[in-house]
């Protein structure tokens, strides 16, 4: 049944993406020439394993302190010095890795396509514990409050002890028969664990007992076919202050209160990539490849960039006062946060950048589907004031 489920998910993902890409044209938008208005430098770059399969695997980059951690689907796990890219240690697992790493509390957590949750020491990569949740893992874990919180593709959210991996609690959400291939990454905020699910809901549970604190419907099902009714919340729920922000495929982007899950505002917008926020705006990479800024307070659309349509954008990040997205050709795009104007491009390879970029101090870490890991630096944004 698991194999059938995975095949259906992959087929649905391909069909849904194809539908999104063929609304206006079959090919990605052609980039028009651009003279860079800011100076972007590659500080260091390295290769992590070989090219990954063309699947939405949850492999990415994790940072804790001055260390950077990365992994390949073939089981390679590596640690680097953040500032220089110097290799600190590396190990090889005999397991097909599909999610992680996640870093926190001295631990490094990885997930496998067979449902293994594997804990390592950040210091030297020595093994700590290993358990199996009997479900494929497609998103990195969350670490906090003495827990490792893991989401499986079967709709279960597991709260594992960070000490030995024993299960403290498990929460089960009903999973639709068909869904996009991918799962929302859980997050731990205060005494709550937050996660989105394939049924369009965002769930908050207490980290102590796993009791549901609240759940909110971000996706709303419409249409007559199962494809039209896909409403997965695959993007990570973003926490900022007392606010939460979530977005669903073929659904809505919403601002919620962290304490109760009450929806403050919601706007129709489709995304499975994700969003970023700052003090004024909410930035979303849509399923069609637009980049949209919404007013943080009201949800009103403030600008929309359409020149990157069908370029399979990554989730946006806010880095040094600007909005950054990456695309299918290994190109990283810098946008003006206030206007959406394109400021600069920087190539880090020729392969898609599917995994979320990571802001680490004054560096931006970019991990391509071919395993190329790059640390970039751009100058801080300086606002001008009228005289």
Q: Could you describe each region identified by the protein language model?
A:
Residues 283-293, 300-334:
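Loop/turn-rich, solvent-exposed surfaces of beta-rich toroidal or solenoidal domains
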Residues 72, 112, 152-153, 197-198, ...:
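Structural signature of WD-repeat beta-propellers
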Residues 1-21:
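Sec-dependent bacterial lipoprotein signal peptides
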Residues 81-84, 121-124, 161-164, 207-210, ...:
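Short loop/turn segments that connect beta-strands within beta-propeller blades
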Residues 25, 37-62, 89-104, 127-144, ...:
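Extracytoplasmic beta-rich repeat domains
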Residues 15-37:
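Bacterial Sec signal peptide processing site at the extreme N-terminus
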């Amino acid at each position: 049944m698991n194999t059938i489920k995975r095949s259906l998910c992959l087929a649905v993902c391909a069909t849904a993406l194809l539908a999104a890409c063929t609304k206006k044209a079959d090919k990605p938008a052609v980039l028009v020439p651009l003279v860079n208005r800011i100076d972007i430098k590659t500080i260091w770059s390295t290769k992590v394993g070989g090219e990954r399969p063309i699947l939405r695997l949850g492999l990415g980059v994790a940072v804790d302190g001055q260390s950077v951690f990365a992994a390949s689907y073939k089981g390679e796990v590596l640690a680097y010095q953040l500032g220089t890219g110097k290799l600190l240690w590396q190990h090889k697992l005999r397991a097909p890795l599909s999610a992680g790493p996640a870093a926190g509390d001295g631990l490094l957590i990885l997930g496998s396509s067979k449902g293994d949750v594997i804990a390592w020491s950040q210091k030297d990569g020595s093994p700590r514990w290993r358990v199996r949740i009997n479900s494929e893992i497609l998103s990195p874990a969350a670490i906090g409050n003495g827990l490792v919180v893991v989401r499986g593709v079967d709709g279960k959210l597991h709260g594992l002890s960070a000490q030995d991996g024993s299960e403290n609690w498990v929460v089960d959400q009903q999973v639709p028969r068909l869904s996009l291939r991918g799962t929302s990454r859980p997050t731990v905020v205060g005494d709550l664990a937050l996660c989105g699910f394939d049924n369009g809901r965002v769930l908050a549970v207490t980290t102590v007992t796993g009791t549901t604190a609240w759940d909110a419907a971000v996706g709303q099902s419409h249409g007559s076919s199962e494809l039209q009714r896909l409403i997965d919340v695959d993007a990570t729920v973003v926490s900022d202050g007392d606010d939460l922000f979530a977005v669903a495929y073929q659904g809505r982007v919403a601002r919620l209160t962290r304490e109760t899950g009450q929806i403050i505002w919601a706007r129709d917008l489709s995304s499975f990539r994700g969003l970023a926020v700052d003090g004024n705006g909410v930035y979303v990479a849509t399923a069609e490849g637009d980049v949209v800024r919404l007013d943080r307070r009201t949800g009103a659309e403030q600008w929309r960039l359409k020149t990157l349509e069908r370029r399979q954008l990554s989730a946006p990040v806010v880095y040094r006062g600007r909005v950054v997205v990456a695309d299918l050709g290994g190109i990283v795009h810098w946008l003006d946060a206030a206007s959406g104007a394109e400021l600069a491009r920087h190539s880090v390879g020729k392969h898609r950048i599917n995994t979320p970029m990571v802001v680490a101090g004054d560096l931006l870490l970019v991990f391509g589907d071919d395993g190329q890991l790059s640390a970039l630096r751009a100058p801080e944004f300086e606002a001008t004031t009228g005289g």
